């Protein structure tokens, strides 16, 4: 049995601060629970710092309430750090104080001025969210990031983020027109470029605002020569406290130059007015392939002479990982493989403009250069033409940061020297020395980045659980800092300083005290994100050294090796945050999108699972043994009931917090398919539930869900009685109140036997299949039944049989056998294993007869390919085809059918775990002369039985309204492949959606 787990309480003074904040009128959430703190202890870096608490302001007034309290003498020891998307690679948002998360509520687009091309947004607005709102106006916010679907504008400002296209579009700072910030003590600062008269007024202002203006002006006037010689002339100039740009090109004084990139160490940016640009109307991406990565780098200078928008580079390691990723099927055509001459580097060279003729002329001139120049060895090039094609390739490039974390084994590329910048003309030589440095340590590495800007993301591969390898972080950081300085570059070229700030004093030299004085004017007691960039002059506290912070690996290594090897997807989550994608029309992750609570995301759940495993180990519990050595249900009942009573009486147990996070998971498996690291939450969720309910008694609801597949065949003998009982108001109310189940489906009252007779359907038995001749086997299939389409949607099962019959195939019906998916979802893993072994044995015997197996519902069918393969003792399971996979082999081309357009709204599990599936449906329809377009959708909110659980009603509806509800009434009939999706639409709208099979049956010729 697992242990009851106590947790670390917040340190002294923090509970008092939080109580004072509650009493101040703060309207957002205040969370000091261990789950929230654990999830916010990591970002996309190698570090882990447990905060004391987290606060989620509702608006700028809430931020001011926090800052006002901070200014009181009694709370001078309280530290605060802002957090946006949590995508930083250097620990910028990590703290052992309080996290101020601006992303949950302060994420509104306040104003769009199309004529003057500017927007006003709150700090928590996600970059892609902003660009989606701007797109109808033909505008966009320019700085392009690989994390743009979860990075917030506030985070971009705080790190002065840049990325692809920065040589053309500049950095975030170049697009900031005005900022609204809250300073320590609660004062508001409205900063924008001002002339000297306005500067005099600002310096004369009372309080902290006047103080910071006076200090900034003094530094700018007295240190001008030192500033000029210290700040490098690079596209990626120094971020944070950028004294070199306190005066802009028009001579105006702009305090935003020091606020951009300050990482929240000077104040809290709550709102920004931003410059936006017209979207280029036409784009072409030239994808150039090389025989070596160094050739790709050395070629960059010559390519830049053609003035492209940008040049992005990717090495072979990243390219090989991309080939195994969900995204590859959409871009493979642009990177043809040649086994004799493998591609070891690529440059993605973009040209864009408003006139296709002008863009194409530039592209042709560029191609002529490629064909005539022999200075490097190129393998060839391809063109991605138009916005849609260019976006597909860039999506692959954007996933590089996550893909590098998905190498096999424990030695994985780590971010700690990954954003160095040098003059572009020095890049190839610099990288040669960088590679020699890493080669000297015997390390592998992956590289990608912005060669036009002289920035390459380099991630040395280390097993951070190995203390010997983890100890290399400091000497490598020291060596790379020295190397960049030798080449006239920067250690911090793009991702901010964060916990690499110890190199700041050496770099700034005599100018560093000026930074300290500026910090002191904003934050005299070092309370705002302390230890980063600089400390106030005279402060006893220093900068946090690279090796002075707990590493994630330091804690991971305390987990028993057998345990972390058995839970790889939880341990290997690297925090890239792809699951924080804001887009409601992206499948991953529906519970995060609906709640905006980070523990309800794959990253959050992986963090909690990792910490739970660690704490169980500290309590001397072997979770693997606990899973193996389960006591009988009856024997363990008294202990479970005692533990339930203790839980209800308020006994602390971190397991309850983990359970709450796992219970919120829809088990849609989008994370297993979409996450670059392939974090599979449903897998370790089921294992956790099994262990948790070894200590705590399950609710009756779990048993009803788990047994559904086994009981429904018997209940189906009396469908009228079952439907009358389940459809009655008093039974529905009883189930909702006492069991926690709502909107239970009713059994189909359909004459299935008539279909079986009409289409001469036989039972699939080994003797029956062996009697078939080879020719007959080629024209036969075995239909594998699932509980949902068989008993709750029988007309669809009948439609498939009719379709197969029309196509000249005889259907054999596999004997009904419980698939086991509901058991797996609820954590009944012992019962699931028995069902899987029994079912797989039966299916293997049938498959050995040489007749293909086909299943209807994607979520149920894919269990045979995924969950079954992990069952101990199960020697494989034959592949059960999805309907479209089978139709691709048997459906002939025919004359165009009647005109009509259809839209496919695919099941989350299907489209994320079998990416080719939606394209296959499109091809099936094309063979009938029909047009089918795959609709971009998120989750429908049902996901099996999730939407039927009373505790999930509100979230289920929210998820449905975020995406599916907005798509149903567009032109073209919507079609859904998932039983649960069709059920949700019917429940929410009283509308019946068809399965694509029903349309194929309608139009397929006899």
From Swiss-Prot:
Enzyme nomenclature, EC number: 1.1.99.39
In the UniProt record, the gene name given for this protein reads: ydiJ
Write out the residues that bind [4Fe-4S] cluster: 665, 668, 671, 675
Relate the protein's function as given in its record: Catalyzes the oxidation of D-2-hydroxyglutarate (D-2-HGA) to 2-oxoglutarate. Is involved in a D-lysine catabolic pathway.
Q: What happens when the gene is disrupted?
A: Deletion mutant cannot grow on D-lysine as a sole carbon source and shows attenuated growth on L-lysine. Mutant accumulates D-2-hydroxyglutarate.
Cofactor, free-text remark: Binds 1 [4Fe-4S] cluster.
Please tell me where (R)-2-hydroxyglutarate binds in this chain: 397, 495
Domain of life of the native organism: Bacteria
Question: Which GO molecular function terms does the record list?
Answer: 4 iron, 4 sulfur cluster binding; D-lactate dehydrogenase (cytochrome) activity; D-lactate dehydrogenase activity; FAD binding; metal ion binding
Origin species, per record, is Pseudomonas putida (strain ATCC 47054 / DSM 6125 / CFBP 8728 / NCIMB 11950 / KT2440)
Return the protein name.
Answer: D-2-hydroxyglutarate dehydrogenase
